[in-house]
Amino acid sequence: MNEVRYYQKNIMIVDDDPDIVLSLQELFEREGFQVTTAENGRTCLVELEKGFQGIIILDLMMPIMDGIETIKKMTIDGFTDENTIIVLTAKRIQGEEFNEIYPYIADYITKPFDISTLLNTVKKIAQKPPVKRRY
């Protein structure tokens, strides 16, 4: 049986809902991923400054620093070059606000979400070697 190879094994879950964070952490750890968590954008940036590289599952509606502001700051600091962002949020955005973040995200999944859709999205991304992107 062929074992699936994951090039990106690190996942950061950035969400202020502890139930979602715990559920996703347990799911991805069972799948063999190393999971880091952050309760808002500011904490996410701290983890990135410590050297986190991988897949970031990011909510847009959070206190202290929301997801859109986090993506903007990640772009300025160069963190979008080596990390893959999946937006997972109840916030529906469009127009200019969406256009600002679209170039930097791999997928946009709305809450409530199907767990298998998120898991399959993460697995597809993780199976690809990381690409250093320049925007």
Where are these regions (language model features)?
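Charged docking surfaces used in two-component/phosphorelay signaling
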Residues: L22-R30
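Helix N-cap/capping motif at the beta->alpha junctions
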Residues: T37-V46, G67
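Short amphipathic alpha-helix used as the core "switch/output" element in two-component signaling
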Residues: V46, I68-D81
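Active-site beta3 strand of CheY-like receiver
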Residues: F52-I57
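Receiver (REC) domain active-site loop signature in two-component systems and cognate sites
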Residues: M62
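Hydrophobic/aromatic residues positioned on beta-strands within the core alpha/beta folds
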Residues: L88-T89
